[in-house]
């Protein structure tokens, strides 16, 4: 820093000497825009430049530059973090470990851990509780719900009880009901519909079935009616074949009777003429 100031002083002295040795010329006429700077103004500007120029920034760098960051580093830098480490770092976690760490978990274990299982709330207390809900208590309850109780209930719902109920709903009762709905009842009903009463069926067959063994030939009847008038037919024929009369009467409505009225009309005409 001192060498820089000395160089500036030498440079200023040299410029002053050279300016004194140069011959003075007439000054050119100044315009309105030009400013005449005196020596005092130049010196003031150079003095101001020493505060804001690059050299002054270097002077300020002692507070803001790397050196100042190193100074702050004692609080925030690596060294400061190591200092804070006494509370938050590994050492402090080890200190907190007495409450929450492995050691503390062992201490808490006295209430919830394995050590308590070896004491009042462990297997011994479970065995004590087991006297009510465990195997022994289940055996005690077994008198009502276990196998023994099921055998007792068996008298009503078991095999024995089913045999007793079987008198109503079992095989015996079904045989008793069989008298109404079984084979016997069907045989009784068979007298009306079954095979046991063939004579009744023959009588019933007379209404719907074939009463006579020889079927009448209705074509021959039509031929006879066309050739011989119905009134001139012998009485024996009317008596022997009563179904012919009914068929002829029915035939007049549905059958082929367009030829028969012609003979009847001629016969009626001859009878009228006679």
UniProtKB/Swiss-Prot annotation:
Propeptide, chain numbering:
20-67, 77-91, 101-136, 146-148, 158-172, 182-274
Annotated positions of the Tryptophan amide modification:
76, 100, 145, 157, 181
The record's principal subcellular location, in a coarse class, is secreted
Q: Which keywords describe this protein according to UniProt? A: Amidation, Cleavage on pair of basic residues, Hormone, Secreted, Signal
Q: Where is the signal peptide?
A: 1-19
Coiled coil residues, start to end:
none
| GO BP terms, alphabetized | instar larval development
Which cell locations does it reside in? Answer: Secreted
* Domain of life of the native organism: Eukaryota
One GO cellular component this record assigns the protein to is: extracellular space
Instruction: Spell out the molecular function terms from Gene Ontology.
Output: hormone activity
User: What role does it play?
Assistant: Inhibits ecdysteroid biosynthesis in the prothoracic gland of fifth instar larvae, with maximum inhibition during the spinning stage. When administered to day 8 fifth instar larvae it produces a significant delay in the commencement spinning behavior.
Q: What is this protein called?
A: Prothoracicostatic peptide
User: What's the source species for this entry?
Assistant: Bombyx mori (Silk moth)
């Amino acid at each position: 820093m001192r060498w820089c100031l000395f160089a500036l002083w030498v440079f200023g002295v040299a410029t002053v000497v050279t300016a004194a040795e140069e011959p003075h010329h007439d000054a050119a006429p100044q315009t309105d825009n030009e400013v005449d700077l005196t020596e005092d103004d130049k010196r003031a500007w150079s003095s101001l430049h020493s505060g804001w120029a690059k050299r002054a920034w270097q002077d300020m760098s002692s507070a803001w530059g790397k050196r100042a960051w190193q100074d702050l580093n004692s609080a925030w830098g690596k060294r400061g973090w190591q200092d804070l480490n006494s509370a938050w770092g590994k050492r402090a976690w080890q200190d907190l470990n007495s409450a929450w760490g492995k050691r503390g978990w062992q201490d808490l274990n006295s209430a919830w851990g394995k050590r308590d299982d070896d004491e009042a709330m462990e297997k011994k207390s479970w065995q004590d509780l087991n006297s009510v809900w465990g195997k022994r208590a289940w055996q005690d309850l077994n008198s009502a719900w276990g196998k023994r109780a099921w055998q007792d209930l068996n008298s009503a719902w078991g095999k024995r009880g089913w045999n007793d109920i079987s008198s109503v709903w079992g095989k015996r009762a079904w045989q008793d009901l069989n008298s109404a709905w079984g084979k016997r009842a069907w045989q009784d009903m068979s007298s009306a519909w079954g095979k046991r009463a063939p004579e009744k069926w023959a009588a019933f067959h007379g209404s719907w079935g074939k009463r006579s063994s020889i079927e009448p030939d209705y074509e021959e009847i039509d031929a006879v009616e066309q050739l011989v008038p119905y009134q001139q037919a012998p009485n024996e024929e009317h008596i022997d074949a009563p179904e012919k009369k009914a068929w002829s009467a029915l035939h007049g409505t549905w059958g082929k009777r367009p030829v028969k009225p012609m003979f009847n009309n001629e016969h009626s005409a001859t009878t009228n003429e006679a």
